[in-house]
Curated annotation (Swiss-Prot):
Compartment(s): Cytoplasm, Cytoskeleton, Microtubule organizing center, Centrosome; Membrane; Cytoplasm, Cytoskeleton
Native source species: Homo sapiens
Organism lineage string: Eukaryota, Metazoa, Chordata, Craniata, Vertebrata
UniProt modified residues of type N-acetylalanine: 2
Modified residues (Phosphothreonine): 134, 198
Annotated Gene Ontology cellular component terms: centrosome; cytoplasm; cytosol; dynactin complex; dynein complex; extracellular exosome; growth cone; kinetochore
Identification of the protein by name: Dynactin subunit 2
Gene assigned in the entry: DCTN2
Amino acid sequence: MADPKYADLPGIARNEPDVYETSDLPEDDQAEFDAEELTSTSVEHIIVNPNAAYDKFKDKRVGTKGLDFSDRIGKTKRTGYESGEYEMLGEGLGVKETPQQKYQRLLHEVQELTTEVEKIKTTVKESATEEKLTPVLLAKQLAALKQQLVASHLEKLLGPDAAINLTDPDGALAKRLLLQLEATKNSKGGSGGKTTGTPPDSSLVTYELHSRPEQDKFSQAAKVAELEKRLTELETAVRCDQDAQNPLSAGLQGACLMETVELLQAKVSALDLAVLDQVEARLQSVLGKVNEIAKHKASVEDADTQSKVHQLYETIQRWSPIASTLPELVQRLVTIKQLHEQAMQFGQLLTHLDTTQQMIANSLKDNTTLLTQVQTTMRENLATVEGNFASIDERMKKLGK
C-alpha cells in the first residue's frame, strides 16, 4: 500500500500495486543488432523435431560403468564414452533385447568382423608357422555364420513388423496366417504373404513351414541343463559337510536330494517316543560293556608297559659291559683308520714306482736296440773306410811307379 500522506494528492492511482520505473539504458546498450542469416551453401541447415527427439531418447539412460573422466595422472588410459554406427543395449538397464534387435546386432557384428578379417588378409601372408585360426579360415567361418543368419528367414517370416511381433514369434506367425486365411476367404483368389508362387487354383494358398529340429533340441537341452544346475545348487544348499565326529551327519552325502531326504526321515523316525525306550535300554547295556572293555584295556596296557620296561632293563644290563669298552674300541678304529690311510698312500707310491720302473726298463730296451744298430752301422762304415784307404794306397803306389 502507498504511504497515507500521498493519499489525497491528484494523479495518484488508488487500489493498484506500486510500480517503480527506472531510467533508460545507456545509448551503447540500446543499440539493436539484426542477426544475419547464413545463406552459404556450405552450411547445412538441420531441422530438429523436438517431439521426435524426445520420443527417441525417452526412457534412455547413459551407462557410466567403467568410465573415468578424472584428471588424475597415471599410466592407465582414461576411458570415456564410446559410440559406433550401431548402439547396443547397455548392461544393467533392465531392458531385454527383442529377437529383432538380437538379429540386427548379430548381422552388424558379423559385418564388422568380416571387414576386419578382409583387412587382415590383405596385410598378413599365409605361412606354415601361422596359428590354427588363419584369416582365410576365419573368413570362411564368417561367411558360413552370415549364411546361417540369413537362412533363418526372420525378416521373410514376420515382415517389416518383426520388431513388434518377434517378442512372440510363434504367436505372431499364427496370427498372421489366420489373417491371411481370412483375407483369402474374403477375396477368393488373393494369395497369402507366404506363398512361394501363384498356384493353379486361385482358391488355394501354399505356405512354407520352416522347421529347425536342431534348434528345438538345443533349446530342450538348455532347459534340461538349467534344471539340473538349479537342482544341483539346491542339493548343495541342503547337503551338509561330512563330520567324522558327529554321528548324526554320517551318510548324508547322498548322490541326490531324495537320498538325503530319505536318510533324514529315517533318522527322525528313530527319535520316536516308542523307540527311545528300547534305544535307552540298548545304550545302557552297551555302556556296561564299554566300561568292562575300558577296565580290561587298562589292565592290558599296564601289562604291556611292564613288559616294555623289563625289556629296556635287560637291554641296559647287556649294554653296560659294552659301554665300558666302547672308548677303547673307538680309539682303535681311529688308529686303524690312520694306518689304512698310510697303507693306501704306500700302495699308491709302490704303484707309481712300479710304473716308473717299467718305463725305465722299456727305455733301456729301446736304447740297447739303438746301440746295437749304431755299432752295426759303425762297423759297416769302418769297413768301407778301410776299403777306401786300401784303394787309395794302391793308387798312390801305382802313381809312384
